Amino acid sequence: MVLLLFLVLFFVPESVVCQRPNPNGVEFNTSGNMYTSGSAYINNNGLIRLTNSTPQTTGQVFYNDQLRFKNSVNGTVSSFSTTFVFSIEFHNGIYGGYGIAFVICPTRDLSPTFPTTYLGLFNRSNMGDPKNHIVAVELDTKVDQQFEDKDANHVGIDINTLVSDTVALAGYYMDNGTFRSLLLNSGQPMQIWIEYDSKQKQINVTLHPLYVPKPKIPLLSLEKDLSPYLLELMYVGFTSTTGDLTASHYILGWTFKMNGTTPDIDPSRLPKIPRYNQPWIQSPNGILTISLTVSGVIILIILSLSLWLFLKRKKLLEVLEDWEVQFGPHRFAFKDLHIATKGFKDTEVLGKGGFGKVYKGTLPVSNVEIAVKMVSHDSRQGMREFIAEIATIGRLRHPNLVRLQGYCRHKGELYLVYDCMAKGSLDKFLYHQQTGNLDWSQRFKIIKDVASGLYYLHQQWVQVIIHRDIKPANILLDANMNAKLGDFGLAKLCDHGTDPQTSHVAGTLGYISPELSRTGKASTRSDVFAFGIVMLEIACGRKPILPRASQREMVLTDWVLECWENEDIMQVLDHKIGQEYVEEQAALVLKLGLFCSHPVAAIRPNMSSVIQLLDSVAQLPHNLLDIVQTREVHRGTEISGEAADSPESCSIAPLTFTESFVSHGR
């Protein structure tokens, strides 16, 4: 397929022809190829100004021709990549405007749409309508509770609505993982990259200052197939709005490419941003504005003094700790959490873990359901380390991981705010009759969901994350019975290919691997061991150790292995499943569970191999029974963590497993 490449290079003079050959396809520039509407215009230097000093207005610019995003009406969306340089400058020293949105839409005429908070994309009646076929990335500089905004300086990915699928504070990640925030309406030029991978079904958004190289870690990453949302032919462009207060929204340069990485923009060739013209000072409106400003300053001074006196008398002083500088934008007000949980009443307790109680709640105004974990601030140093982990893990976004929304500190207590899982934890379904029974298809899907989340932690994120406490109580189910791995209170981080540091043995009895109990060194293989136990537990409907059971059935793995040796492995299945199960799937789960929970760490598969086996892409070794019967630790294979997570292969004919830490697209 011929690649379509257009370069909207705004520094190219208008006399240049509008189309010319290019080694990568067809190249375009601004001459005659841009469609403007509303307050938008393009000056002689190619600078786009979307909005001006006119209040309650919308400015939009689109590439004049439609682009083919699909090969057919029902086809899949092709990969695409775009980058642009923008600047947002407020007027008269007052923050105004509502930001910029890069938009992919089926028409250049989005009317009737509203300015202000709707960014010229939607109106009240068509918000959330699947017929919109709009995908946008918003650079939002205003807070609007109806769109679940948490701050006035964020970046979000929007699909058919301004309630973002995923959102983050504006900023960028350095190579060492440190987060640096940016102020979108600072007037400084910034560059943003929006890249969609059709194979991974993933869209990444990366923001950075103009003269800083593109970061390796994206600000936003969303796994979503865009094929149901985009049509075969679509327009691409920008939209921006103002309210009663105004701002200038500029696009200095823009490139876009289908099926490849778009070329970078040369900052030295970008047009200059003009200073905002201020003839208003000499006008009656200008005099009135100055008078109101002076009066406002006097009132502000009086209010500031009153506030200072109030804070001086306040007994409780919240000190901003180091870790909060990075995680601060996600801080919740204690008042909101207190209202949401009805004053942290015992009737709202969902459960109690190793770090504290978990409460259910509903946030005021937005009515979003949340789960709040209360953590005692017993050890300052311990809490600092714990939150350093949480701050990093809070950036994770995966459909099979419970999302950490933010935190709150109040009177020495720490509160972690998570998405609320409507169905609760998996152990309640396995062991509490009143919760309801799980059929085989639900159990198999839960196993695959947890495997997907664990694979992301081990091999797909920029760092290796070792969960260290995988068990049914930490597997949560949403309203649609989708499983999500949660409770990262014991999780550890390390770089790909490095050796996790030894620490105290953490986890739950029955799920701790032999090498972890001996050395105290957790690894991805010790997580795989616990996952294998959980697989058996889901299939058999019983705990890994039953002290009061017969000697034969006391240890789950021993019992399953014995039944396999006696060629009657199906007898271990949970009797509540009945006869409604797929025998091949059940056998795979039981045998793979024994494989993953093998006492020798080096023999266990990694999670990418587990995914292949569960998806029937690969087959279990034909001699797997002989392998799992080898219960002793052979010389040279007593693995604690180093060898288990090294990039070397562990070959088990006819299937070869390789621990390969790959950072996809990072």
Swiss-Prot record:
Question: Which residues carry attached sugars according to the database record?
Answer: 29, 74, 123, 176, 204, 259
Query: Which PROSITE patterns does the protein's record reference?
Result: LECTIN_LEGUME_BETA, PROTEIN_KINASE_ATP, PROTEIN_KINASE_DOM, PROTEIN_KINASE_ST
Q: Which residues cross the membrane?
A: 290-310
* InterPro entries membership: ConA-like_dom_sf (IPR013320), Kinase-like_dom_sf (IPR011009), L-type_Lectin-RKs (IPR050528), Legume_lectin_dom (IPR001220), Prot_kinase_dom (IPR000719), Protein_kinase_ATP_BS (IPR017441), Ser/Thr_kinase_AS (IPR008271)
Which ranges of this chain reside in the Extracellular compartment per its record? 19-289
Tell me the residue ranges located in the Cytoplasmic compartment per UniProt.
311-666
Reaction equation(s) it catalyzes: L-seryl-[protein] + ATP = O-phospho-L-seryl-[protein] + ADP + H(+); L-threonyl-[protein] + ATP = O-phospho-L-threonyl-[protein] + ADP + H(+)
EC top class named in words: transferase
**What domain of life does the native source organism fall in?**
Eukaryota
- Cleaved signal peptide residues: 1-18
The name of this protein is Putative L-type lectin-domain containing receptor kinase V.1
What organism does this protein naturally occur in? Arabidopsis thaliana (Mouse-ear cress)
